[in-house]
Amino acid sequence: MKKLIILGIVLGISLSGCKKDEPAPVQDNEFISTMRLTFTEGTNKLVYSIKDLDGDGGNAPVIDVIKLLPNKTYTFTTEFLDETKNPAVNLTSEIKAESAEHLVIFEPNSTNLLSVTRTDKDSRNFEVGLMATAKTTTAANGTMKVTLKHQPEVGGQPTKNGTATIGTTDFEGTFKVEIK
């Protein structure tokens, strides 16, 4: 009988000392309502944006048409904002600080429309895309999809490898583009 009591106590202590490991907390992404591209050619600045203040679903986003001149090279920046807050919160500096976990992808629907080259790099020498150049060719119309990918570390190891296939989409939108 004593053995059963002792066994019960030992079993109770050993079971109460075991607990499941809690999963690592998932980092919530900030809400991004607006993506803004600012093109510069010489002294001319052109600003275009996609605004989706209510997120996926609900109202359709407001999307500017990018209008550029043919046979020009533009430098441009990409910014991400949360304009649902007052004042609006510019999230670009946070993305830049975490550049080893982010990639902006530019996908013109035709190379005859324009070509985009990312010009900024992260600490591992992978492109980021907050700064870029765009080269236009002849007059043309088309689209350009812009995607911000979040490519966080997994198990303390970086996942970003310079490709768009890894990670989750933080923001995505497609601009109409007119070169004329």
Regions found by a protein language model. Give the residues of each.
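Positively charged n-region of N-terminal signal peptides that target proteins for export
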Residues: M1-L4
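Bacterial Sec-dependent N-terminal signal peptides
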Residues: G8, G12-L37
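First exposed extracellular module after export/assembly in secreted or surface-exposed proteins
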Residues: V26-K180
